[in-house]
UniProtKB/Swiss-Prot annotation:
Pfam family, one: Ldh_1_C
Entry binding sites for substrate: 83, 89, 121, 152
Reaction equations catalysed: (S)-malate + NAD(+) = oxaloacetate + NADH + H(+)
Function, in words: Catalyzes the reversible oxidation of malate to oxaloacetate.
Protein's name according to its UniProt entry: Malate dehydrogenase
One GO term of the biological process aspect: lactate metabolic process
Alphabetical keyword list: NAD, Oxidoreductase, Tricarboxylic acid cycle
Residues at which NAD(+) binds: 10-15, 34, 96, 119-121
Family membership noted in the UniProt record: Belongs to the LDH/MDH superfamily. MDH type 3 family.
Highest taxon in the source lineage: Bacteria
Length: 320
């Protein structure tokens, strides 16, 4: 019986963390790809030596050749330049678009049946471009943003309410950027919606508004503190949750950047919405009723993503 194969494109901080998580969870054998010679090989060797201590038998291989991703069941793409202080996600557009082109062509030639998760920023534009360059079905290419943004929102809410993060369920829609939409009315503690908790005196609207804003700039807060790069532990953990739902056919409801063709009034665009991920990839897009303010915020987010796509088409005419 063939073992499951997970290919990680990009052997930076997120790629290395993904490799460790995938191996330690025994999700499958891991191929770590990078264009820089020696880096993926060194990280794979280092990580494989965790096996005897942690007790995993997953094989790890580092490579600079796309041929080695052949037959991958899941591909997680982190290749590209990370944000530095003062950079917006959109500043990365030109550099990372070129990276997506080579990655997309590598996937198309070697692993056209894979389920692909993109993490590269600016996320909503890069996942769209990666899908275009790879030619894979839309339901097999998604972007990791909402799981991470929702986790950040949940972390801050758990701190505010002094409750376990396990009992906090949050919902973040829209683009992965300053226009994201944390939906307060669908976020709960043990099933109790946040607006009800405000009425119960657990918090105030002003404090929740501040948490929403902190969630929006959650990535930037970490970039400013690290000064040399961006978040990698939580992004990797979030992508692994998505991969696991696909590989184990768990059918988890997760917010992801998914391709919309009419849902939420959006067409031909990747935007963060709740989806069901199972063995067929994105099996269903969950359309929830939004308040007028959430709808308006989502539209702002959609418009921001559209602007990025116009810029992408301006940089690479093959996308037009």
């Amino acid at each position: 019986m063939a073992r499951t194969k997970i290919a990680l494109i990009g052997a930076g901080n997120i790629g290395g963390t993904l490799a460790h998580l995938a191996a330690s969870k025994e999700l499958g054998d891991v191929v770590l790809f990078d264009v820089v010679e020696g880096v993926p090989q060194g990280k794979a060797l280092d990580l494989s030596q965790c096996g005897p201590v942690e007790g995993f038998d997953a094989k790890l291989k580092g490579t600079n050749d796309y041929a080695d991703i052949a037959g991958a069941d899941v591909i997680i793409v982190t290749a590209g330049v990370a944000r530095k202080p003062g950079m917006s996600r959109d500043d990365l557009l030109g550099i990372n678009l070129k990276v997506m082109k080579s990655v997309g062509e590598g996937i198309k030639a070697n692993a056209p049946d894979a389920f692909v998760i993109c993490i590269t920023n600016p996320l909503d534009a890069m996942v769209w471009a990666l899908r275009e360059f790879s030619g894979l079905p839309h339901n097999k290419v998604v972007g990791m943003a909402g799981v991470l943004d929702s986790a950040r929102f949940a972390t801050f809410l758990a701190e505010e309410f002094n409750v376990s993060v396990q009992d906090v369920t949050t919902f973040v829609l829209g683009g992965h950027g300053d226009t994201m939409v944390p939906v307060v009315e669908y976020s709960t503690v043990a099933g109790i919606p946040i607006p009800d908790l405000i009425k119960m005196g657990w918090s105030t609207q002003e404090r929740i508004d501040a948490i929403v804003q902190r969630t929006r700039s959650g990535g930037g807060e970490i970039v400013a503190l690290l000064k040399t790069g961006s978040a990698f532990y939580a992004p990797a953990t979030s992508a692994i949750a998505m991969a696991e739902s696909y590989l184990k056919d768990k059918k988890r409801v997760l917010p992801c950047a998914a391709y919309l063709s009419g849902e939420y009034g959006v067409d031909d665009l990747y935007v963060g919405v709740p989806v069901i991920i199972g063995a067929n990839g994105v099996e269903k897009i969950v359309e929830i009723n939004l308040s007028d303010s959430a709808k308006a915020n989502l539209q702002v987010s959609v418009d921001a993503v559209k602007e990025l796509l116009v810029a992408c088409k301006g940089i690479d005419s093959s996308l037009a």
